[in-house]
From Swiss-Prot:
Domain called TGS: residue spans: 289-365
UniProt-listed InterPro entries: Beta-grasp_dom_sf, DRG, G_OBG, GTP-bd, GTP-binding_2, GTP1-OBG_CS, P-loop_NTPase, Small_GTP-bd
Organism: Schizosaccharomyces pombe (strain 972 / ATCC 24843) (Fission yeast)
Keyword 4Fe-4S: no
Biological process according to GO: cytoplasmic translation
Positions of GTP binding: 70-77, 116-120, 247-250
Name the record gives this protein: Uncharacterized GTP-binding protein C9.07c
Family of the protein in this entry: Belongs to the TRAFAC class OBG-HflX-like GTPase superfamily. OBG GTPase family.
UniProt keyword annotations, A-Z: GTP-binding, Nucleotide-binding
An example Gene Ontology CC term for this record: cytosol
GO molecular function terms attached to this record: GTP binding; GTPase activity
Domain of life per record: Eukaryota
Length: 366
C-alpha cells in the first residue's frame, strides 16, 4: 500500500505534467485540494508520541517568540549568542545544534524568547531528518528568522519557503478574506464583492466536491486564488511574519551586498563580527507588532522603567487592565491617556479605547 509521501509524489507528478489552461483548471483545482489533504496527514501528529519530540519543544517565556530556521551551519548559533548571550554550540561543521536552544532577549523593556532550532534539510516537510519536529515548533512562533548564508546559493531561500509552506505556514501573508459557512442543504452559494481574476465557479465547486462539501455559503471579499480557498477549507494554516537574515556579509563585495539588500523583508548581518545586529533588533521589534504602554499613578510621574507590553490588535484599555491584574476591570471607572492614540494629552477614555506604542495611562477606579 502506498505511503502518504508516495501518494503526494504521484499527485505532484500529475500536476507537473498537466498543462494549465481553462480546460484543465477544474482538474488542477481538484488535484491541489487532494494534495492539501494528503499533506495534512503529514502535518497532523500521529498517536502515541505527541509533542515536538525530545529536546525540541520548550517552555514559553516572554511576550513573543522568535524562531531561527535555516540549513545547518548558516550561523544560527552565533546569532543566538549575539542576541541573547546564550551559548548554543557552534562549529564549522553541519548539524552542530541537535535540539532547540532557548534564550531571552531583553529589548525595549520586553522579554522576547529566541529559539535556535536545529538545521533543517530539503524534504523536511515530507519527514526527512528532524524537519517535522523543527517545523512543528516554528508553527507556534510569533516571528520566524530565516537565516541564510550569503555564500550559499540563494535558491536555499525558496527551498526553505517551500518546506514551511508545505507544513501549513504562510509567511508574510494575511489570511484570505473568504467567509466559508457550511450548511445542511441548498447547494454551493458563491458571492464576491471584488472581481475574481484567478479562480472561476467550476474550480470552486470542484474543490468543494473534493472536500465533500455539498452545501455552503462562500463569500469572497478578496481576489483569491484556488490555494487561498484550500487554505480556508483546511483551517489549519498559520500566518507568521518572517525576516530573512542574510549572514556572513563580511565575505562578499559591496556590489554583491547591494544586490542581496534588495530582497524584501531582509536584513544583512555578520554574526561573527556583530555587524548590523542593532538594525536586526529594531526590525524584529517592528515585525512583532508589540505595543509598550506606561503606567502613571494619579498625581505622580509616569513609570518608564517597566512598560506593560501588549500586542497590536489586542491593545485596548481593557487588555491593558487585564495584563496588570484581572480585578482591575471590575473596579474600572475611566482612564486618562497621553500619547499617539489620543488627539490631546490626558484625554478621558473607556475600556474599548485602542492604545498605541508608548502611550501613558492613568486608571481611575470606582
Amino acid at each position: 500500500m502506498a505511503t502518504t509521501a508516495q501518494k503526494i509524489k504521484e499527485v505532484e507528478d500529475e500536476m507537473a505534467k498537466t498543462q494549465k489552461n481553462k480546460a484543465t483548471a477544474k482538474h488542477l483545482g481538484m488535484l491541489k485540494a487532494k494534495l492539501a489533504k494528503l499533506k495534512r496527514e503529514l502535518i497532523t501528529p500521529t498517536g502515541g508520541g505527541g509533542g515536538g519530540g525530545l529536546g525540541f519543544d520548550v517552555a514559553r517565556t516572554g511576550i513573543g517568540t522568535v524562531g531561527f530556521i535555516g540549513f545547518p551551519s548558516v550561523g544560527k548559533s552565533t546569532l543566538m549568542t549575539q542576541l541573547t548571550g546564550t551559548r548554543s554550540e557552534a562549529a564549522a561543521y553541519e548539524f552542530t545544534t541537535l535540539t532547540t536552544v532557548p534564550g531571552v532577549l531583553q529589548y525595549n523593556g520586553a522579554k522576547i524568547q529566541i529559539l535556535d532550532l536545529p538545521g533543517i534539510i530539503e524534504g523536511a516537510k515530507d519527514g526527512r531528518g528532524r524537519g517535522k519536529q523543527v517545523i512543528t515548533v516554528a508553527r507556534t512562533c510569533n516571528l520566524i528568522f530565516i537565516v541564510l548564508d550569503v555564500l550559499k546559493p540563494m535558491s536555499h531561500k525558496r527551498i526553505i519557503e517551500e518546506e514551511l509552506e508545505g507544513f501549513g505556514i504562510r509567511l508574510n501573508k494575511e489570511p484570505p478574506n473568504i467567509v466559508f459557512k457550511k450548511k445542511e442543504r441548498g447547494g454551493i452559494n458563491i458571492t464576491n464583492t471584488v472581481p475574481l481574476t484567478h479562480i472561476d465557479l467550476d474550480e470552486i465547486r470542484a474543490v468543494c466536491s473534493e472536500y465533500r462539501v455539498n452545501s455552503a455559503d462562500i463569500a469572497f471579499r478578496c481576489d483569491a486564488t484556488i490555494d487561498d480557498l484550500i487554505d480556508v477549507l483546511e483551517g489549519n494554516r498559520v500566518y507568521i511574519p518572517a525576516l530573512y537574515v542574510l549572514n556572513k556579509i563580511d565575505s562578499i563585495s559591496i556590489e554583491e551586498l547591494d544586490l542581496i539588500d534588495r530582497i524584501p523583508n531582509a536584513v544583512p548581518i555578520c554574526g561573527n563580527r556583530g555587524w548590523n545586529i542593532d538594525e536586526l533588533k529594531e526590525t524584529m521589534w517592528d515585525y512583532l507588532n508589540l505595543v509598550r504602554v506606561y503606567t502613571r499613578p494619579r498625581g505622580l510621574e509616569p513609570d518608564y522603567s517597566e512598560p506593560v507590553i501588549l500586542r497590536t490588535g489586542h491593545s485596548t484599555v481593557e487588555d491593558f487592565c487585564n495584563n496588570i491584574h484581572s480585578s482591575i476591570k471590575s473596579q474600572f471607572k475611566h482612564a486618562y491617556v497621553w500619547g499617539k492614540s489620543v488627539p490631546y494629552p490626558g484625554m478621558r477614555v473607556g475600556l474599548s479605547h485602542v492604545l498605541l506604542d508608548e502611550d501613558v495611562v492613568t486608571i481611575v477606579k470606582k
